[in-house]
Amino acid sequence: VTPLAANADTILYGEARVSVDYIDNHIQGADPYWDVVDDGSKLGVKGTEDLGGGLSALYQWEFSVDMTEGGNFGGLNQKFSGLTGGFGTLTLGTQDTPYWKVLNVIDIWNSSKILNGSTYLGGSVTPETNVNGALSTLPNNVDYQTPIFNGFSAEAMLVLDSDEANTVLGSPNISNNVDIWSVNLKYNQGPYFAG
């Protein structure tokens, strides 16, 4: 049997996100400074395979790439596989949360220092716990996305027994090894978006 990825339509993609920042932490005795900063550059592959009967398999494998310092290859980026069809899309792995997918629409730097998990949560989660934002991308999850109906769609995710979620949110474990749940409802039609 040939592996799925070998037969699937595969796309190689990436994003180079680099900025020149003036940083002033407003700490007494610390001078402001200029720095070249990587704001979430990444490299990845994704693809689909038609399984027939309106059903397709899909996968995505994505890595962080530090464009300024070198190294830092890997990171907590999306790595998942699943099925999609008339029922919607069901995926398993490490993925962006539904919460993040709505907020990400307004953040061109994608989970960087300007809009991160601590900003969204009013400072209740420190950005030092996860450089990508506390609720942006988490492992060990099951995600379901509905089909799109006249611009409306919904998504729900369960994060199951995840060490990363425990590190970020302090062992939440809501019940039966469910660490976090995340949902969204979106409207996206032409130039209009709400979520």
Residue ranges: model-predicted function:
Residues T2-D9:
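Sec/Tat signal peptide C-region and signal peptidase I cleavage site
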Residues D9-D21, D31-D161, K186-G190:
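Outer membrane beta-barrel
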Residues S171-P172, N176-G195:
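Detector for outer-membrane/organellar transmembrane beta-barrel domains
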